[in-house]
Curated annotation (Swiss-Prot):
Function statement: Produces ATP from ADP in the presence of a proton gradient across the membrane. The catalytic sites are hosted primarily by the beta subunits.
Top-rank lineage group of the source organism: Bacteria
NCBIfam families: atpD
Organism, scientific name: Acinetobacter baylyi (strain ATCC 33305 / BD413 / ADP1)
Reaction(s) this enzyme catalyzes, per UniProt: ATP + H2O + 4 H(+)(in) = ADP + phosphate + 5 H(+)(out)
MF term (GO), any: ATP binding
Keyword Ubl conjugation attached: no
Any one annotated GO CC term: proton-transporting ATP synthase complex
InterPro entries according to UniProt: AAA+_ATPase, ATP-synt_VA_C, ATP_synth_F1_bsu, ATPase_a/bsu_AS, ATPase_alpha/beta_chains, ATPase_F1/V1/A1_a/bsu_N, ATPase_F1/V1/A1_a/bsu_N_sf, ATPase_F1/V1/A1_a/bsu_nucl-bd
Coiled-coil ranges (or none): none
Gene: atpD
Protein name: ATP synthase subunit beta
Binding site for ATP: G148, G149, A150, G151, V152, G153, K154, T155
């Protein structure tokens, strides 16, 4: 093992000098002697000097301290022993439940599966959330992004998806908390514990109070654990189907931005790192399904200032199979989940995948909502009375559709007092089919607000 010494410290970026013939490789992990601090080599500057990022606080470090190279990348524990545990970016337990009892470790930097190994699936994953199942259905082994600005419900939507999918799904889940609130990580842990699925979930946290090195690598740590479960074959030669939840992928980009300038790179558009697309690609290309097993990933993506054209969310869009866009306008009108039915898309919304009936109903719903959007300007200027009868009908139906897209969530029960509802896809299709056909034109629109299936609407209307 070669050893060197610290010659410069600027925030999270540390320069270390080694003997010229024993310079560590890029991505090798270095250990600062006498501390818990791990460094990761990012650049070789020449003359035996390497530039590194600290995985943890640099408090108390000083020039001249000795550093030992491990001659290997950062590796983390993998396997069944990680289930039910909370770990940090280096795979160290932070739940005070003793060490992670496994000998198996894998490096966090790995190659993405080759093109020949990948396998696509068209099996649908029912979420029980009407607007998602109807307009932007998820595929098993697909990648989903939840896009939204601050406070429109990304985390609540993700928690509900975890509640509906992870609890019903017999496989394993990995949750990577990247630069998010510690409170949310804590809530998630207790949510899993209370519903008795903690022994099927591995949790990796690098929250927003952590240094940028942790936030930059914690997504890779979670992904490495998920890849192990996917690739570990059972006696039939099959891997597992794994769910990977990442909250929030934007903070991964942000951590890269924080260290990029310190590493001496010129910033690109809006101050992001010039390697933004590559860093995102390296992470996203590994989140994929192979012939042995699948990784279905659901990622929350923060949208700065509600601007979807910002380079960070725009780069993420390219990698996803389904995009669920949360809208501030819909949230402000009191409709939750605040999912925009016209902006959200999915590759699975294809008659060959979801079937002709589902496809036609979804498109008809979008047509009605689009027509209503166009009529809004006329209504604002001239009022409803000036519309043709047929347009009035479109408006009434569109308002009912909008309200019918709202739904009480299980994870929000403690706040709203309303029991959560899970609506099967068949029920969702039946409800919207009837709505479009005019079967429920006589029911007042408030009966459609915050209910489950269409039968509840009818029952609610009778009480009004």
């Amino acid at each position: 093992m070669s050893s060197g010494r610290i010659i410069q410290i600027i925030g999270a970026v540390i320069d270390v000098e080694f003997e010229r013939n024993s310079v560590p490789k890029i991505y090798d992990a270095l250990q600062v002697d006498g501390t818990e601090t791990t460094l990761e080599v990012q650049q070789q500057l020449g003359d035996g000097v390497v530039r590194t990022i600290a995985m943890g606080s640099t408090e108390g470090l000083k020039r001249g301290l000795n550093v030992t190279s491990t001659n290997a990348p950062i590796s983390v524990p993998v396997g069944p022993a990680t289930l039910g545990r909370i770990m940090d970016v280096l795979g160290r337990p932070i739940d005070e439940a003793g060490p992670v009892a496994t000998e198996e470790r894998l490096p966090i930097h790995r190659q993405a599966p080759s093109y020949a190994e990948q396998a696509a699936s068209t099996d649908l994953l029912e979420t029980g959330i009407k607007v998602i199942d109807l307009l932007c259905p998820f595929a098993k082994g697909g990648k989903v992004g939840l896009f939204g600005g601050a406070g429109v419900g990304k985390t609540v939507n993700m928690m509900e998806l975890i509640n509906n999918i992870a609890k019903a799904h017999s496989g394993l889940s990995v949750f990577a908390g990247v630069g998010e609130r510690t409170r949310e990580g804590n809530d998630f842990y207790h949510e899993m514990k209370d519903s008795n699925v903690l022994d099927k979930v591995a949790m990796v946290y690098g929250q927003m109070n952590e240094p940028p090195g942790n936030r930059l690598r914690v997504a890779l740590t979670g992904l490495t654990m998920a890849e192990y479960f996917r690739d570990q074959k059972d006696e039939n030669g099959k891997g597992r189907d794994v769910l990977l939840f990442v909250d929030n992928i934007y903070r991964y980009t942000l951590a890269g931005t924080e260290v990029s300038a310190l590493l001496g790179r010129m910033p690109s558009a809006v101050g992001y790192q010039p390697t933004l697309a590559e860093e995102m690609g390296v992470l996203q290309e590994r989140i994929t399904s192979t012939k042995s097993g699948s990784i279905t990933s659901i990622q929350a993506v923060y949208v700065p200032a509600d601007d979807l054209t910002d380079p960070s969310p725009a780069t993420t869009f390219a990698h996803l199979d389904a995009t669920v866009v949360l809208s501030r306008d819909i949230a402000s009108s009191g409709i939750y989940p605040a999912i925009d039915p016209l902006d959200s898309t999915s590759r699975q919304l294809d008659p060959l995948v979801v079937g002709q009936e589902h496809y036609e109903i979804a498109r008809s719903v979008q047509n009605v909502l689009q027509r209503y959007k166009e009529l809004k300007d006329i209504i604002a200027i001239l009022g409803m009375d000036e519309l043709a009868e047929e347009d009035k009908l479109v408006v009434y139906r569109a308002r009912k559709i909008q309200r019918f897209f709202s739904q009480p969530f299980h994870v929000a029960e403690v706040f709203t007092g309303a029991p959560g509802k899970l609506v099967p896809l068949k029920e969702t299709i039946r409800g919207f089919k009837g709505l479009l056909a005019g079967e429920y034109d006589h029911i007042p629109e408030q009966a459609f607000y915050m209910v489950g299936g269409i039968d509840e609407v009818i029952a609610k209307a009778e009480k009004l």
